[in-house]
Amino acid sequence: MSRPDENKNEHPVVHPIPPVYRADSRILILGSFPSVKSRETGFFYGHPQNRFWKVTAAVCGEEVPQTVEEKKAFLLRNHIAVWDVIASCVITGSSDASIRDVVPNPLQDILECADIRQIYCNGATAWKYYRKYQEKQLGREAVRLPSTSPANAAWSVER
């Protein structure tokens, strides 16, 4: 049971990072919502322990990009678009489990401009909210991938 004033100071956090894509993007990778660290750095998968950049670099046969500019160039060079399912929500820290009051991102903006052939969701939370808010509207199924978040301790790059 919650205390009456427990949620008093909670307010929606608005997604601060624009999507990365261009007309020749073929793959769209969706996260749920940026972590605190990503919001601080101003770019996707900003936590140093997040495995996203290591995994995508390995899949693409490239070195792991380090700077935001290198990461953007890497994504575009490999025809990868990146964004998140959620535009705003109430969230405690970076905890996906605490997400509520979701407003979805307008993913159709990317799909109308880019040659997206496959949509992937990075983790269960992104997939859950994609299916809830986007799948029917867009008429596109997404593939659920293991989360690259450091919170997903059961999964590693080596596996």
Located regions from the model:
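C-terminal capping/extension of enzyme domains
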Residues: 1-26, 48, 93-104, 108, ...
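N-terminal nucleotide-binding beta1-loop-alpha1 segment
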Residues: 29-30
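N-terminal phosphate-binding or glycine-rich loops at protein starts, especially the Walker A/P-loop
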Residues: 34
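Short, solvent-exposed loop/turn segments at secondary-structure junctions
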Residues: 37, 128-129
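Short, surface-exposed acidic-centric catalytic microdomains
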Residues: 37-98
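Alpha-helix N-cap/helix-start and coil->helix boundary motif
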Residues: 50, 126-127
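Residue-level signal for well-ordered alpha-helical scaffold segments within enzymatic catalytic domains
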Residues: 54-58, 109, 113, 132
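Internal catalytic-core helix/loop-beta-alpha segment
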Residues: 77-126
